[in-house]
Every structure is written in structure tokens, then in C-alpha cells.
Amino acid sequence: MERRAALKGLATAIGGLVVLPSWASNWNHTTLQPTDLLSAEETPLLASVVDTIIPKTDTPGAKELGVDRFIQLMIKDCYDSKAQETLKKGLATVEEDSKETFGKSFTACNAAQRIHILEGMGLSDDATSKGFFTMVKGLTIQGYMSSEYVMTNITKYEMIPARWNGCVPVNQ
């Protein structure tokens, strides 16, 4: 190795170690951008939709397992801007339909009223409504089935799938 390249690399590393703590010390929750895709009004609405799709029974529901946060994260990080707009428009449609049909917010409706609204969206001829319902339902199932609670307590997740237990004893 050349001495000049080694000294240059060493100087860069030392400079980085000196500057990094002062740069990172200014980070806090107010200076970082919010990671949520939805607004403060839309987040509980999505949680209610998710809770309607997989409600709490003798096992925790989708809302309790944080599936609404999973959906936001997936759509924000893995889907395109069209899907993000579909989610926002779909939530607005859910709220509008609820107010038109029952005269109250979707989050204030009982379980039967919520199911009625979501079934109507699933059977709708409107591509945006149907696309929203299909996307949210699929992500709800995916998030619920891949949650820690379901994987460990319901489906009995095995770290080594299809392990082979021989029928002949092995002698050492």
C-alpha cells in the first residue's frame, strides 16, 4: 500500500469520527421528518377498517397487532405513488359513504354498519373503491398472518421448516 493513500484514508476516517457526533446530536423527533403516510385523521380510520376486516375474538384483532401501521409502512416503502393515492382516496370514500349512509363517522359506526360499508366497496363498480378494498384486505391478511403473535401462538412457526426426523436411532 502506498503511504500517501494510507494517510489520506486515515485522515478521512478521523475527520468523520470527529464530525459525526456533532452532526448526529442535532437529531430529535422534531427535526426528523414524520414517517407516517397518513394524516392524524386518516390513521384511526385505517385502524377501524383493519379492525373490521379481522376483529378481536378470543385472539387479538388486526388493530391490536398493529396491522394498520404495517399497511402504512408497506404502502409507503413498497408501493408506488398511485397506490398511496388509492389508499388516501379509499379512506376518504369510506368516510363519505359512512356519513351519507349512517350519518356518522366510520369510526363511530357499529360492527354491522362497518361491514356493510366495506362489503359495498368490495362489490362496487368503481375501480378506485374496489382497488382500495382489495389492497387493504390483502395487506391486512398479510400483516396479521406475519405478526409475531400469529406466527408463534397460532401457526406454530418453525425456524427450520420441513425438518427431517429419522426413524433409525443414531449411535455415536
Language-model regions, residue ranges each:
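Post-signal-peptide N-terminal segment of Sec-exported extracytoplasmic proteins
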Residues: V49-E64
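Sec-dependent signal peptide hydrophobic core
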Residues: L10-G15
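A ubiquitous short alpha-helical element
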Residues: L32-L37, I54-P55, C78-L87
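C-terminal segment of N-terminal export signals and the immediately downstream linker at the start
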Residues: M1, A5, V18-I53
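Short alpha-helical hairpin
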Residues: S22-W27, A62-D68
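Mature-region segments of soluble proteins
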Residues: P44-S48, G66-Q172
